[in-house]
Amino acid sequence: TPRRQGRVTLNPLAHLDPLGTILIIFMAFSGYGIGWGKPVPVNPGYFRSPRRDWVMCAFWGPLSNIILAVIFAIPLRVMLASGERLPDSVFVDFILSMVLANIGLAIFNMIPLHPLDGSKVLSGALPDIYDRRYWNFQMVYGPIILFGSILILPLIGLPNPLRFILLPAREFLVDLLLGI
């Protein structure tokens, strides 16, 4: 459990995944920002309805990002409601960065490729026969498709197909939150 692993803390060091941390540092120099933290351990033995509860558990991460984006968007929305342009300031830049980052994380994590949360949400929505096939496929090919799309394709000069999903969805949600 997270408590046994010393992860019930606000200390970010407790949540760093060694490979994810090294990769984000390395990738920052290449212009890509990809990395990850340790996944939150989940004990399905506590689930009353395992299939439904896996979906709910997977959905909470992206939902928490949306909630944070809404909270950070409130001051920007208030400023925009005054009819004035947003001032150029570190505060506004920080708040806008938090809105963009949290919306981006929510959308990215809902992509239905393993190990992202969207794979668990889709898996729970599928009938049992398709769920097993989907899950078997995702366990093997999900990470390959995901990392190939993010890392390999751009390195060989091809566009990342996930951008065609992520950027329009992020733009739509930012416009919705900020009332633009």
Predicted features along the sequence, with ranges:
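Hydrophobic transmembrane alpha-helices and their immediate loop junctions
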Residues: 1-180
